[in-house]
Regions:
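Electrostatic, structured charged patches in enzyme active sites and in nucleic-acid/phosphate-binding
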Residues: 1-198
Length: 198
């Protein structure tokens, strides 16, 4: 891995969030107590809460950081042909067992509106949402840039179901000797629950 990439990842890991989360009318905000990260992680939408829950219990996620600093420029063409280069802070910087990079989590309907308004920034290809300028920036460091489009209603129901069986698992963990097996079973259940949404 190039030294520049190692330095970038280190700065993402040890820098405070680029901005504070904001409360918005009609949205859900709060703090998620993460055992994986040993901190409370703020969220400002149901989508972000679902993303945090998923990454918290995903064995393939090593670490994840909200509102990763510093912000960076996204260069793309607007609908009018003008060149835009706004500073941008993705929702998360995620270290996975097979890759590392930035991630955006947005409602599906919001992504469709953004793609119509900024077609060179958000696009859908083969059913997957992408951000070409974000991917271009990440590629400079050998990293990834992922865009997750979610149905808010399905995500909310799945999150509620997920918390229900997670709480049950916590109680059973106190009576089982083989906690490793329990964790493996719960990880499979978590993936099955969330794959219905992804």
């Amino acid at each position: 891995m190039p030294a520049e990439t190692v330095d970038l990842i280190a700065r993402r890991r040890f820098s405070p969030p680029a901005r504070r989360t904001q409360e918005r009318a009609g949205n859900v905000s709060g703090l998620f107590p993460s055992r994986k990260m040993s901190v409370t992680i703020p969220f400002e939408s149901q989508i972000e809460l679902g993303a945090i829950s998923l990454m918290e219990y995903d064995a393939g996620v090593v670490e994840f950081y909200d509102q990763p600093a510093p912000a960076f420029k996204l260069s793309y063409q607007t609908r009018s042909g003008r060149q835009a280069a706004p500073f941008h802070t993705p929702d998360f910087f995620v270290l996975r067992t097979d890759q590392a990079g930035w991630e955006e989590w947005k409602p599906e309907d919001q992504l469709r509106k953004l793609a119509e308004k900024r077609p060179f920034r958000y696009q859908q290809r083969d059913g997957q949402w992408i951000c070409p300028p974000g991917a271009a920036y990440a590629a400079r460091f050998g990293l990834s840039y992922r865009v997750h489009g979610k149905n808010a209603g399905k995500l909310q129901r799945s999150h509620r179901d997920f918390l229900a069986f997670s709480s049950d698992s916590g109680r059973r963990a106190q009576t089982r000797e083989n906690k490793g097996l329990l964790l493996a079973v719960d990880t499979i259940k978590a993936r099955e629950t969330w794959e219905a949404v992804v």
